[in-house]
Amino acid sequence: EQMKYNLTDDRVFGKMYYGNLVDFIDEDKLEEAQNKIKEQKESVIVYGVGAGLVSHGDVYVYFDMARWEIQLRYRKGMANYNVDNYDEDILKKYKRGYFIEWRIADKHKEKCFECFDYVVDTNKSKDPKMISKDTFKISLHQLSKQPFRTVPYFDPGVWGGQWMKEVCNLDKDQSNYAWSFDGVPEENSILFDYDGITFELPAMDLVLYQPKELLGEQVYSRFGAEFPIRFDFLDTMEGQNLSLQVHPLTEYIKKNFGMSYTQDES
């Protein structure tokens, strides 16, 4: 019910949620959980979304996952947070994530940067990896000062062609590839090498943790901790005609979707 206004009745379009994780927390139950922990004589593990609101404890671990991996898990039947919508239309799952869950999670994550002791890469199921807070911070600080690229991902679509399949050495069993998301920090990830071990973080971590260093003062002052450019490539070779891309004016996108800026394509 609390999300109804932002979810809307539309299959794809929603409205941005600008609240916080605490908006969905029952204060009485939170206090009850905190009191239970205080009463315990032995070690207690608190886990789950917003566990840090209950207690930071002696060791605070943040579990991280890129949004592309989240989308892939939606397709495999994973539900949105705290909702039994396992079989729901993937576009509706994505809408709930894009307009509500990811906004809340980003705000919560920003507050966690100075609190957690370790970060866990959960992008590969049953193969988690962990780094310390210091390693996390040093890595992102260094990255903000040098050239880098995000991990691309490819997806089929209505107009999809065959060119990327050959040039990028992609799965030949796929019917086509329409999209190559090559520089969309909100959804792409970044790979780090630590003594031969590959560690994956959402590229949004860099945007949120080092926004001024990454974007520059002028861009940051206009857009805040968001990456306002999306680099993606479309393949129609031996495919269908590209769909007509229509983007609203700034006033319209603010009024109807709660978004602070629009986009143009070239």
Predicted regions and their residues:
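ATP-dependent small-molecule kinase phosphotransfer cores
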Residues: 1-43
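Generic structural signal of hydrophobic/aromatic residues within well-ordered alpha-helices
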Residues: 3, 21, 30-37, 70, ...
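Generic secondary-structure transition motif, activating predominantly at the C-termini of alpha-helices
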Residues: 25, 38, 74, 78, ...
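ATP-dependent NMP and nucleoside kinases share a basic, alpha-helical "lid"
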Residues: 31-83
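Small-molecule kinase domains that catalyze NTP-dependent phosphoryl transfer to phosphate-bearing small molecules
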Residues: 51-52, 76-138
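Glycine-rich loops and low-complexity Gly/Arg-rich segments
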Residues: 68-73, 84-89, 143-147, 256-259
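Transition-metal
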Residues: 116-121, 125-266
